[in-house]
C-alpha cells in the first residue's frame, strides 16, 4: 500500500468529535437515556471520547459500552461478505435507551447492520442512531449515519485508515492506495 494523504490530524479529529458531541446533544434534546456503543475496535475509544466531551458540556455522565463484530477478512483491507457477532459482545442494557452506535469508518454498511442486529437481539431500544468519524461511501445497504465527522468520496482502490492514540499511539485519518 502506498500512502496518499492525511485526511484528519489530531486537532482536526478533536474538532470533529466536539462537533459530533454537540450534534448528539442537540438532536436528542439533551442526554437523557443516551448510551454510546463503540463498535470494536476503534469505535470504542471514539465513543469514550465523545462521551467525555458530552460530560464536559452537559455535566452528565453518559453510559458507554461496546459491541464486538468480528469480521472475516481476506486481508487487512477488505471485509468479507458477512460481519459476525461475538455472542457475548454487548456489555450494556439497551432496553428503552437511545443507542448511538459509534464506528471509525462507514463503508459498505455491513458492520453497522450487524451491530444493529446485535443491539436488537439484546433488547428493544427506544431508537438506534449511528455516528462515524469518516463516511467513505460505497454503500451496499440502505444505511446512513446520523452523525458524520467527514464525508470522503473514495475509490474502491483506496483504504481509509483511522488511527487512535489508545490503540495506534497517534491520532490521524490517512488514505492509502491499494
Swiss-Prot record:
What is any one GO biological process for this UniProt entry? DNA-templated transcription termination
Q: Name one GO molecular function term.
A: uracil phosphoribosyltransferase activity
InterPro entries the record matches: PRibTrfase_dom, PRTase-like, PyrR, PyrR_bifunctional
**Record's keyword terms, sorted:** Glycosyltransferase, RNA-binding, Transcription, Transcription regulation, Transcription termination, Transferase
Locus of motif PRPP-binding: 99-111
Output the superkingdom of the source species: Bacteria
Query: Which reaction equation describes what this protein catalyses?
Result: UMP + diphosphate = 5-phospho-alpha-D-ribose 1-diphosphate + uracil
Enzyme Commission number: 2.4.2.9
Q: How does it assemble?
A: Homodimer and homohexamer; in equilibrium.
Instruction: Return the similarity comment.
Output: Belongs to the purine/pyrimidine phosphoribosyltransferase family. PyrR subfamily.
Protein known as: Bifunctional protein PyrR
What is the species of this protein? Answer: Clostridium novyi (strain NT)
Gene that specifies this protein: pyrR
